[in-house]
């Protein structure tokens, strides 16, 4: 059984070795001189305008977290959709309960005003 996973493990080892080898090799042979130009933030070849340390409104982080939450919901729903015929009524009830719990969470977030941009 271990033999079936051998190509995947070999691929992971080669990828890790290549990545780590590239980082170590570039740090060994790369130049170590830092100048003001090299330490400036890169903005698409244009001159930097203002500071790179801007504060973002907390709403952006909240929307990103909600996006990740509902994206994970889709990840959990995909295997259920693939195995729907094998799971039968039990799988339908289980996923229905899962979706209802997430919908209640969505309503809670909506009622708290997290989705409003004022």
Swiss-Prot record:
Belongs to the complex I subunit 3 family. Coiled coil: none annotated. InterPro entries: NAD(P)H_OxRDtase_bac/plastid (IPR023043), NADH_UbQ/plastoQ_OxRdtase_su3 (IPR000440), NDAH_ubi_oxred_su3_sf (IPR038430). It is an enzyme of class 7 (translocase). Its EC number is 7.1.1.-. The chain crosses the membrane at residues 5-25, 62-82, 87-107. Keywords: Cell membrane, Membrane, NAD, Quinone, Translocase, Transmembrane, Transmembrane helix, Transport. Pfam families: Oxidored_q4. It comes from the Bacteria. The keyword Phosphoprotein does not apply. It is a multi-pass membrane protein. NDH-1 is composed of 14 different subunits. Subunits NuoA, H, J, K, L, M, N constitute the membrane sector of the complex. One of its GO terms (cellular component) is plasma membrane. The keyword Transmembrane helix applies. GO terms for molecular function: NADH dehydrogenase (ubiquinone) activity; NADH:ubiquinone reductase (non-electrogenic) activity; quinone binding. It catalyses: a quinone + NADH + 5 H(+)(in) = a quinol + NAD(+) + 4 H(+)(out). Signal peptide: none annotated. It is found in: Cell membrane. This is NADH-quinone oxidoreductase subunit A. NDH-1 shuttles electrons from NADH, via FMN and iron-sulfur (Fe-S) centers, to quinones in the respiratory chain. The immediate electron acceptor for the enzyme in this species is believed to be a menaquinone. Couples the redox reaction to proton translocation (for every two electrons transferred, four hydrogen ions are translocated across the cytoplasmic membrane), and thus conserves the redox energy in a proton gradient.
